[in-house]
């Protein structure tokens, strides 16, 4: 059976932590920023962890 190819689009959006979880940048920080509070924009800078419901799918696409 051949090797699975990594989905490069998925691999470019996520980073793997030391414990095997996935980190990704948060959505909502590209445009329409005038309606958001400074606190909300500041918190959107930090990357978030992928929830358990999607973790298995993304890991399979990244061949982990």
From Swiss-Prot:
Basic residues bias: start-end ranges: 23-44
On whether Chaperone is a keyword of this UniProt record, the answer is no
Which Gene3D superfamilies does the record associate with it? 4.10.410.60
Q: Name one GO cellular component term.
A: cytosolic large ribosomal subunit
Sorted alphabetically, the keyword list is:
Ribonucleoprotein, Ribosomal protein
Q: State the InterPro entries in the record.
A: Ribosomal_bL35 (IPR001706), Ribosomal_bL35-like (IPR021137), Ribosomal_bL35_sf (IPR037229)
Work out whether the entry's keyword set contains Transcription regulation. no
- Stretches the record annotates as Disordered: 19-44
Family membership noted in the UniProt record: Belongs to the bacterial ribosomal protein bL35 family.
Can you name this protein?
Large ribosomal subunit protein bL35
């Amino acid at each position: 059976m051949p090797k699975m190819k990594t989905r490069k689009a998925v691999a470019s959006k996520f980073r793997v932590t030391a414990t095997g979880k996935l980190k990704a940048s948060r959505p909502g920080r590209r445009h329409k920023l005038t309606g958001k509070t400074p606190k909300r924009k500041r918190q959107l800078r930090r990357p978030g962890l992928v929830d358990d419901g999607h973790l298995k799918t993304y890991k399979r696409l990244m061949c982990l």
